[in-house]
């Protein structure tokens, strides 16, 4: 029976909560809400949905993640990492397909948390994370080319794949709108220089306000009407969304399951990475499993109100910390601020230029790319570089689902290869030095291995990757000793293939009248072997606690054999 480990940080934090804490959380929440606004709009539009869906996601998912999450300062909402996935799902399955996939991902995240797999997510190889994060950054940048250059495709559908997009772009680069280019460059410039004047005011917000006002004045008094705004493409609704559950059918669930896994894995990685970074800054420890359950609930509920996939956002979480956020209350305030903006200020969003949002996303993609880290990993071992490059190019050329699946498979194969290389099997046929043995008392004389006895020392996991290696070593020796002592003091675990290998070895040895003795089996391996029935075949009298005892048994066996021979 799995015991539910669900302990939201909000409830433990409120036990010693003060008015001062509330004041700082209130101010931090307001600032984070303002920071989240342009990003939520930009991520929503870039994902292929309306701007208010991005804000709704930040409200609903942001509230749930703060209310039920396992981190004190985590801020949840839509992120750039999901843009590529969402855009692809909508193109192939439509909005309803996105809703189903997101809700399925929510269920998967809840299960990951219930079965306490939060810590395992952290062990996904770093090259895979960097590879697909950098790949996503390139893809996000690619999706913004049309708005940066003001390209018009005359109703022609923009392909979902990387190569298809660039082919379409090149066919229309003869009709660049230079006003769009100027707006994008000015936006990027403002975002880049704002931190030099103020660390607390987000550059993206400053850029959107200044550029929107500038473009509005150009349209009103300069006669410049060729700069597209949000209002030119979307109908802005300043109202609460109605709850709606998508129609579910088995065929859709089967088709969308791989995509749901991708959303869940990516959401888990990004949220736990964000929470871990936050821990390092505030000196706290988040609860990974509680965080995953909260993320799952958020992703299950958000689509019902028209939201898209959400996760913990590192940039907004750091903004929360830097502005004094101390508890999940700040995240709840951030959601309330966005709700008020949605209800009362949303009509103003129609004046925001699309080229300005493209500039915001160019900065997002640059920050996400982590090109310095990527460059540094290229100096690592070839196996890591292989995983990095394959994951990166698969993300860019195909999609994130393929990249994560293939990247994880390659990482697993390389991991097994490394374990096989580190697991050593040595053969001792003469003597053992007690001064170098941790499971023996130190004696003056060396332990002599009797004639007709071979000692095999296994150092590392006894799993399917090493089982054949053991067989090859014995075959290479070619001789047939009277007794084989298999020393397993440094075997941390054994799998079913290892058990099968030992069983086969024991059966073959018995047919050849070769006696098998196990030495130094730890409690974990001992329990597995006993449960498998292997001890019934071998005989418990042939299980020795250390090599000294095993050699004593072997010496007696050899003496009895020689006596019987005479």
Residue spans of the language-model regions?
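Transmembrane helical cores of multi-pass ion-transport proteins
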Residues: 1-430, 434
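Short, contiguous clusters of charged residues that form electrostatic/catalytic patches at enzyme active sites
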Residues: 28, 188, 192, 468, ...
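Conserved SAM-binding loop
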Residues: 75, 518, 543
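Generic hydrophobic alpha-helical segments
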Residues: 86, 166, 470-474, 550, ...
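Short beta-to-alpha loop/turn elements within the nucleotide-binding domains of ABC transporters
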Residues: 115, 497, 545
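The feature marks cytosolic C-terminal regulatory regions of anion transporters and related permeases
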Residues: 367-537, 555-563
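Short acidic-hydrophobic, aromatic-tinged amphipathic segments that line or gate anion-handling sites
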Residues: 537-553
């Amino acid at each position: 029976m799995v015991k539910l480990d669900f302990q939201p940080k909000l409830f433990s934090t409120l036990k010693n909560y003060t008015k001062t804490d509330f004041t700082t959380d209130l101010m931090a929440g307001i600032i984070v809400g303002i920071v989240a606004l342009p990003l939520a709009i930009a991520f929503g539009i870039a994902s292929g949905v309306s701007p208010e869906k991005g804000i709704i996601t930040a409200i609903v998912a942001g509230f749930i993640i703060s209310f039920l999450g396992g981190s004190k300062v985590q801020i949840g909402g839509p992120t750039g990492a999901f843009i590529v996935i969402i855009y692809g799902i909508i193109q192939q399955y439509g909005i309803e397909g996105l809703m189903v996939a997101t809700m399925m991902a929510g269920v998967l995240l809840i299960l990951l948390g219930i079965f306490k797999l939060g810590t395992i997510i952290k062990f996904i190889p770093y090259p895979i994370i960097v590879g697909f994060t950098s790949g996503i950054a390139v893809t996000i940048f690619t999706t913004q080319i049309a708005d940066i250059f003001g390209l018009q495709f005359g109703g022609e559908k923009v392909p979902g794949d990387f190569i298809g997009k660039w082919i379409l772009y090149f066919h229309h680069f003869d009709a660049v709108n230079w006003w769009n280019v100027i707006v994008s460059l000015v936006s990027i410039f403002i975002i880049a220089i704002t931190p030099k004047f103020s660390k607390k005011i987000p550059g993206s917000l400053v850029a959107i306000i200044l550029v929107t006002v500038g473009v509005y004045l150009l349209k009103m008094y300069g006669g410049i009407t060729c700069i597209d705004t949000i209002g030119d493409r979307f109908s802005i609704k300043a109202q609460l969304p109605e709850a709606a559950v998508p129609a579910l059918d088995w065929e859709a669930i089967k088709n969308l399951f791989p995509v749901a896994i991708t959303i869940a894995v990516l959401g888990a990685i990004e949220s736990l990475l964000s929470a871990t970074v936050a821990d390092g800054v505030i000196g706290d420890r988040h609860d990974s499993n509680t965080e995953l359950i909260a993320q799952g609930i958020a992703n299950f509920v958000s689509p019902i109100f028209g939201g898209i996939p959400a996760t913990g956002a590192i940039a907004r979480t750091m903004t929360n910390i830097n502005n004094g956020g101390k508890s999940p209350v700040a995240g709840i305030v951030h959601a309330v601020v966005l709700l008020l903006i949605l209800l009362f200020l949303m009509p103003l969003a129609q004046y925001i230029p699309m080229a300005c949002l493209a500039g915001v996303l160019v900065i997002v993609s640059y920050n996400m790319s982590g090109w310095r880290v990527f460059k540094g990993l290229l100096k690592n071992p070839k196996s890591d570089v292989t995983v990095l490059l394959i994951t990166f190019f698969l993300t860019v050329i195909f999609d994130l689902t393929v990249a994560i699946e293939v990247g994880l498979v390659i990482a697993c194969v390389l991991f097994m290869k490394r374990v096989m290389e580190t697991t050593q099997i040595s053969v001792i046929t003469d003597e053992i030095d007690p001064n170098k043995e941790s499971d023996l008392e130190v004696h003056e004389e060396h332990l002599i291995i009797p004639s007709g006895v071979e000692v095999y020392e296994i150092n590392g996991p006894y799993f399917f990757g090493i089982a054949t290696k053991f067989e090859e070593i014995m075959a290479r020796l070619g001789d047939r000793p009277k007794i084989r002592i298999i020393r397993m003091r440094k075997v941390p675990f054994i799998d079913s293939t290892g058990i099968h290998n030992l069983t086969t070895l024991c059966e073959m040895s018995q047919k050849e009248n070769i006696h098998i003795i196990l030495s130094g089996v730890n409690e974990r391996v001992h329990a597995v072997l006993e449960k498998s029935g292997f001890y019934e075949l071998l005989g418990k009298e042939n299980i020795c606690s250390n090599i000294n005892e095993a050699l004593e048994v072997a010496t007696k066996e050899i003496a009895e054999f020689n006596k019987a021979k005479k």
